Amino acid sequence: MSVASFLTGEKLLAGSKFVIGKYNVTIEKYIAEGGFSHVYLVQTNSKTDGSPITAVLKRMYSPDENALRFVKTEIETMELLKSNPHVVSYIDSCIFPLEKAGVNTGFEILLLMEYCAGGGLIDFMNQRLQTRLSEHEVLKIISDIVQGVASLHYLRPPLIHRDLKVENVLLSFNTFKLCDFGSVTEPMHAAENSSEIQALEKSINTFTTYQYRAPEMINLYSGLGIDEKSDMWALGVLLYKLCYYTTPFETQGPNAILTASYSFPPFPPYSHSLKNVIIALLQPNPCLRPNIFQLMCEICRLRGTALPFRDIYSGRESSFYDLHNRKIMSLLRQTTTTPFAGNQVMPTPQVQGSRPPPPPPMPAPIYNVPNVPTVPTVSPNPFLQPTFSGTSQASAHPSIHSQSATFNNTQDVNRQSVSSPKVVSSSSVTGSGASGRKVYTPQSKNPFPISQGVTGTSSKFSASEVTEDNGSPNAGLDADNVDVEEVVNQRYPDLNELESQLTSHTNITTSSHHNPREQEIAKLADDAFASFRQTAGTSTANSTHTTGTQDISAFDTNFSEGVGSVRSSFDFPDRPVSRRPSSTSRSSVKITGPSSPNARSMAYEQHSFNLDDLSNTNFGSNNSLRHAKSFSKYYSPSHKDSNKTSRNTSKEGLPSSPTMLYRTTSNTRGDYIVQRTQQSANPLTNIEPQDMSNLSTDINASDVVADSTNSILYPTSTASSVANTIASDVDDFGTFNGLQRTVSLHSERASLDKKRPSFHDKNPYFKFSPSKYVDEGLEGESELRERVRSYANRSSSSFHNPDLTDTEIQETSFNNDLRPVASIQSAETSRSVSDRPANFPEELNDTLFEQKYPGIVDYEEPNSNAEKNVNI
């Protein structure tokens, strides 16, 4: 084969035969081509046993030895990862030199690999062009891809793919596999001079795709190395494209990538949990992006599956939400700090109004790891080189404050710009201790304080240090074969180190002279830390955790009952609520309703009950901690139009309310049954619905209408969330990383007026600490209790609904058996509705009645002299 025929696109004919290693190959058909490669479907027969195999032949061309080196890297990488089920399997390969007139003109490489009958991921996405991918499918695809990327990141030294995109993912028997390892390389240090920058820029332009490049690949003067976190950014872009069939920066320039300026389209709708993963991955600061294990933890939590591999990043938490909090606080620091001179030391900030720093994390235990030689410590920052060693690792960390002082103010609260490196300090950073002091000399300036000790050619590990029993390099994901765990504190900042950046801030709520940017930043900072406190369900002795079960987050829980369920967790401190499984925790409250044929035939999905005066409740000192923007209306697109979706049910005798509070179903008798499902572990999101079956008075539809201002509040999702069959009610509740990005500061939340908080708004900025709530209760609780008691103790004369006319309600009274009966008369029909069947024998006592008809309570005469016991 000549070079000219290869470069002019001449393809191999069907039936052509080759010998590649130990396989006889016959060309069947041409599949696709790349820049310097052709792909064919072939049939192979092993020379040893003659077994036929359908495979793929990738025919590549390299003009010189330097280009051949990258092809060999691809072959060696595939051979190293051939046991991973989420990587396209390597079969065999061979290299032929090409000559013309006795002169070497390049090399031809034949790579034989696994055939994926499902085609490419891009073909699978095109088949769903109209309906798009469901959230379950998106999580399945990204889970397989992450496991393939983890096989690279878990090698020692780690490898980065550099060209992660949907075009490099194939489908084989319901498994998505990673392919095209021609861009694989080891982590690279930041370029320090113009020649290195030019060489790095050429390499990036050759081996990466522009829309998937991380900010550190765009701004080569930022002083940031290119490592595994660059792959994490590409995974965020890939995940975004799986959801919305476009990249987040498709129509924007490089500045959009540098500042992570993008938005989420309204269609298709996905849960906030999935959007949070995208937001965490697309962070301009590599420190704030999760590592591959943290990403896998979040995906497994959303899917409800077990982790497929262990955590080698010792000393770090699996949740990256706390790291995202640091970004919010760094934005706050930009407006509260002033620039420092080059030789001036930044004072240590005093944190006020926030939680104290957590204790230092304990090192993760290492099980079944043999004794290994001690690995010499290296500098925690690749851009600061030690002159000699001798201090502890804790004292080796340079000051993080001076490094982060070069952050630039941006025009958007959800953006961080990558600036050119600036001189922070001309003095050296020294460690502590009288002897064995380690002195660091700044080599290059980094606007993001990423501590990375394993970059380029690894200073900690070599390929020979971690091997299999047969002498081959270890693939990295087998827990039993990991001999050395990485000390991640040498590579990335510790959580305590990041939290030390927090600066003091005052109560912005009572100040009116702050500009809109400061108000928005303060609100985000307050809400981020107030929303993620320890939940009440896990902070008490009653909390349990079963090994092997899904860890349900109190702020993002997918209930098995799905959309249409009533979520309840308003547990008053003095009355413990028993936690039962969802199959047994269902209770119903019978409400006698309108008896018209329309009412019986209609499928009432929602009823509107409102508690207007609940918003007038004084919430005490917690109210002063909230910014004015925290009182805004629905912040997410799935809730902002709930006022427009309210069903007008006034013609059926039910009030029209702007808030959809809970859903009911109608049985054959025309009764509306309010169903409760399993209680949520989060007391912030919902109020515990009252068990109306324990009240000492029955409730009918007219009473609810008459006393709508004293009704109990049942939060639920809106009609727009019902349309999304993927996202549950809890997924619609936004966490702090659910703050959706916009292209300008003038977001939808900034334009809303201040309003009092209410539970049914499902306000994501509701700021009561779960632990404080359980210990002290909620202010205004006594008023709620008294209101329920007064409702239960009303006399029969108070059962009158002023909203219904005399022609609609003829009378409301109690019969001799003290059974509430509401006679509702209309032009169409008139019938009497009772809570007991019409043929119920009167000689049966209450006990037999309750046994035969569970859930229907026979009420007794209200006694004004006796105190009513009402369970709240």
From Swiss-Prot:
Phosphoserine: residues carrying this PTM:
472, 596, 657
In which domain of life is the source organism classified? Eukaryota
Residues forming the catalytic site:
163
Which Gene Ontology molecular function entries are recorded, alphabetically? ATP binding; protein serine kinase activity; protein serine/threonine kinase activity
Question: What Pfam families has UniProt attached to this entry?
Answer: Pkinase
Q: Which GO terms describe its cellular component?
A: actin cortical patch; cytoplasm; cytosol
Occurrences of domain Protein kinase (ranges): 25-310
SMART domains given for it?
A: S_TKc
Q: Polar residues composition bias: which ranges?
A: 384-416, 452-473
Q: What is its main location?
A: cytoplasm
Q: Which PROSITE patterns match?
A: PROTEIN_KINASE_DOM (PS50011), PROTEIN_KINASE_ST (PS00108)
Report biased composition (Low complexity) as residue ranges.
Answer: 365-382, 417-436, 579-589
Q: Does the keyword Cytoplasm apply?
A: yes
Q: Where is this region: Disordered?
A: 339-479, 565-600, 633-664
Q: Name one GO biological process term.
A: signaling
**Enzyme class label:** transferase
- Give compartment(s): Cytoplasm
**Would you tell me the protein name for this molecule?**
Serine/threonine-protein kinase ppk29
* Source species of the chain: Schizosaccharomyces pombe (strain 972 / ATCC 24843)
